[in-house]
Amino acid sequence: MIKAIIGKIIGTRNDRWIKQYKKKVLAINALEPTYEKMSDVELQNAFEELKKRVRSVEKDLQEKTLLEVLPESFAITREASKRILKMRHFDVQLIGGMVLNDGKIAEMKTGEGKTLVATLAVALNAMKGESVYVVTVNDYLAHRDSKEMEPLYQFLGYSVGTITASVRDDDERLEIYSKDIVYGTNNEFGFDYLRDNMKYSLEHKVQKSHAFAIVDEVDSILIDEARTPLIISGPVDRRMENYNKADEVAKSMQVEVDFTIDEKNRAILITEEGIKKAENLFGVDNLYKIENAALSHHLDQALKANYLFFIDKDYIVANNEVVIVDEFTGRLSEGRRFSEGLHQALEAKEGVSIKEESQTLADITFQNYFRMFSKLSGMTGTAQTEATEFLEIYNLEVVSIPTNLAIKRKDLNDLIYKSEKEKFDAVILKIKELHDKGQPVLVGTASIEKSETLHALLKKERIPHTVLNAKQHTKEAEIIKDAGLKGAVTIATNMAGRGVDIKLTDEVKELGGLYIIGTERHESRRIDNQLRGRSGRQGDPGVSQFYLSLEDNLLRIFGSDRIKGVMEKLGLKDGEHIESKLVTRAVENAQKKVENLHFESRKHLLEYDDVANEQRKSVYKFRDELLDINYDISAKIAENREYALNQIFSKLKAFDHQNLSEEELLGLKNILKEDFNASVELEDLEKASPIEKFVAEKLKSDYENKMKALDSEQRSRIERIVYLQILDNAWREHLYTMDNLKTGINLRGYNQKDPLVEYKKESYNLFLELIGDIKIEAIQTFSKIQFENEQDSSDAERYLDNFSEEREHESVTYRHEEALDEDLNVAVKAFSKTPKRNEPCPCGSGKKYKDCCAKSGPKKGLFAK
């Protein structure tokens, strides 16, 4: 309240920003007459001079130079747009362009021309000579926007490319990313980054830099999708019958008897009775014994699948598959799967074929991907409600841009009914009234299920209408475009065709414009504002109103008891409603509660991902060093050899051979043979002094003799490729271990420990272990490299060629599947008796190798404690 009063007196922070930008608008407008007089060639030459000026300065001074040339750049871009696109940027669009250039979020209402606004900042920032990425929510918008704006960019001397899911050829993607301006979806940009860090050549990496990105519908991408990481994964063996058995057990359990449901936190708590029933049905004496951990996990997921996730709301079943419905956009999330076995639990619930669980091979969140950019900005019609999150997570400030024409839409108070049936009856009556007079109406629903309920009611009343939900997503743009026609009735879920304008005829404007009916408040005010924003574009008339009931999820779970109390006191009859600002405010307060819960959830996830992200950056940086032909890989191998030998000798009783027992010398001899393929005589070890120097020189000479047939280029390539494979495999194993750590870390809270602190500690120790494992495995592998003919370098070339072919084939596989089905094949012939970290330990303990002898050493011999 106090903040609002101060804002009215001295102006808000947003007002002050707009005031500053308006001064620059005057400078840009003053240049317009000059550029209007120029010929096309003169205009293009003037723009080229600006490019030269920006590129002539040091990189750290380029941002400052961009600000200096901004008025000329914007004025030329506007003039070029007038000539090429027949569209002139309004003053408010110039302000939007400046906001984007400053690395902020421009909040611009629907129909204000965000696509055209972006051209100002894109054309300016592309002067630096690094690709500018324009990020959209789907392939349709990426293709549409790039094709519409390409003639303007070409006039200014820029090349334009579009990355979509249909571009599958590596060379074609590489060519597109070489363009000055690249349009694409957030998914494509993110997956390409992950793929780049699985490539075995710097030349094959498509994303050369992360200089500047403009994210369209920034709230959808950076807020709504922030909880969903991008993952490239491979299959993991699991017993498929466990999913079906867990589903049977879950279906036999009773709510409030065997388990309780916490709707607010979307969790299920099993009671003592439920545990006993599950143990009886599974045939185990203790569900929570370590050997039954998989069963208890499957049961947890089966209960969630059966009692927290609902068909036509959270997912649909199509073509014998469970397909996720995005809760914020209402779109189908094709190719995306719930993690931790939940998707398999849903498949068991619906009786469709169960697909294997997967192991993460590479992953990143949108939060950490977009935070890599030197400069990031965004556009949307709805950002202010999430301004705090944008600032805290992305360091992005939100600037609300004034509309070019005043908004004429009327936003009416909510109408609240006692039951859902009464609410829908009232909605149908209103639709009939509007349809009879010819005023178009767009009805927003929160789920596919509700949209189809409304569809059935309208069909019963014989009111012609069109339904837009995830099941009809292919016609999205066409359906939304026609929603403003006279007499049109359109039912839409949250997807509501973002990025597609609903244009009105003069006749429809006379009838009052597009009428928006919301049949339920979403958990986020922003989604409601997006629905409202479909009406009243560019000064058009329009109306919006929400119809609610006490049975709506938001009011039932989070709503204030005050609303229920008011309705009970009023003694409303069937079909009657209440309408008041007090009630509307109470509903918005409920939404704020949920928004805060989601924000804390996203922030919490980011805190965990930040730990992995620092490790990811270190690994990817080292990976790039290995890909660099100038990197001294031989020095790295020598360093690893020293480290590995230090690990061996640190376990010996003494460094002087005179104090080593015969058993220890024999153990050392065996280790050198088995792990490093080095044959030494026992008597040579007995004579050697100091022994560590003798062993180090032996390993080095064996390796040098093996590699001497190769020229320096061949040797460097083989060493880099083998090291990369070791690094990649170890990183994948590390991600698997980190996934397992994250899954169980919250249990530390029961021991009065902060799970996040514990996660940071353990993940750091795991990372140190990873680095050590890589060094030891690298020197072991290099020691075992064997060529069929060590005097013939062509043998090494064949290995390199075969490796390149395997990698090329594999890259196509994971581009289609977003998964790798097999481990990489080593590019050289190697042999090893050392098991992989996740294989059973050869000592017979039944544990994984990494949890047994990899840590403690063999039970007998050299590494005995």
Swiss-Prot record:
A single Gene Ontology CC term:
plasma membrane
Residues holding Zn(2+):
C841, C843, C852, C853
What's in the keyword line of the UniProt record?
ATP-binding, Cell inner membrane, Cell membrane, Cytoplasm, Membrane, Metal-binding, Nucleotide-binding, Protein transport, Translocase, Translocation, Transport, Zinc
Q: Which reaction does it catalyse?
A: ATP + H2O + cellular proteinSide 1 = ADP + phosphate + cellular proteinSide 2
Q: Which InterPro entries match?
A: Helicase_ATP-bd, Helicase_C-like, P-loop_NTPase, SEC_C_motif, SecA, SecA_CS, SecA_DEAD, SecA_motor_DEAD
| GO terms for MF | ATP binding; metal ion binding; protein-exporting ATPase activity
Query: What biological function has been recorded for the protein in this entry?
Result: Part of the Sec protein translocase complex. Interacts with the SecYEG preprotein conducting channel. Has a central role in coupling the hydrolysis of ATP to the transfer of proteins into and across the cell membrane, serving as an ATP-driven molecular motor driving the stepwise translocation of polypeptide chains across the membrane.
The organism that produces this protein has a lineage beginning with: Bacteria, Pseudomonadati, Campylobacterota, Epsilonproteobacteria, Campylobacterales
By which gene is this protein encoded? secA
Provide the E.C. number(s) assigned to this enzyme. 7.4.2.8
Q: How does it assemble?
A: Monomer and homodimer. Part of the essential Sec protein translocation apparatus which comprises SecA, SecYEG and auxiliary proteins SecDF-YajC and YidC.
Q: Which cofactor does it need?
A: Zn(2+)
| Protein name per the record | Protein translocase subunit SecA
Tell me where on the tree of life, at the top rank, the source sits: Bacteria
Pfam families noted in UniProt: P-loop_SecA, SEC-C, SecA_DEAD, SecA_PP_bind, SecA_SW
Output the CDD domains linked to this UniProt entry.
DEXDc_SecA, SF2_C_secA
Give the organism, scientific name.
Answer: Helicobacter pylori (strain J99 / ATCC 700824) (Campylobacter pylori J99)
Entry's family note:
Belongs to the SecA family.
Q: How is the cofactor bound?
A: May bind 1 zinc ion per subunit.
- The yes or no answer to whether the keyword Lipid metabolism is present is no
Where does the record place it?
Cell inner membrane; Cytoplasm
Q: Which GO terms describe its biological process?
A: intracellular protein transmembrane transport; protein import; protein targeting; protein transport by the Sec complex
Residues given in the record as ATP binding sites:
Q93, G111, E112, G113, K114, T115, D501
Q: How does it sit in the membrane?
A: Peripheral membrane protein
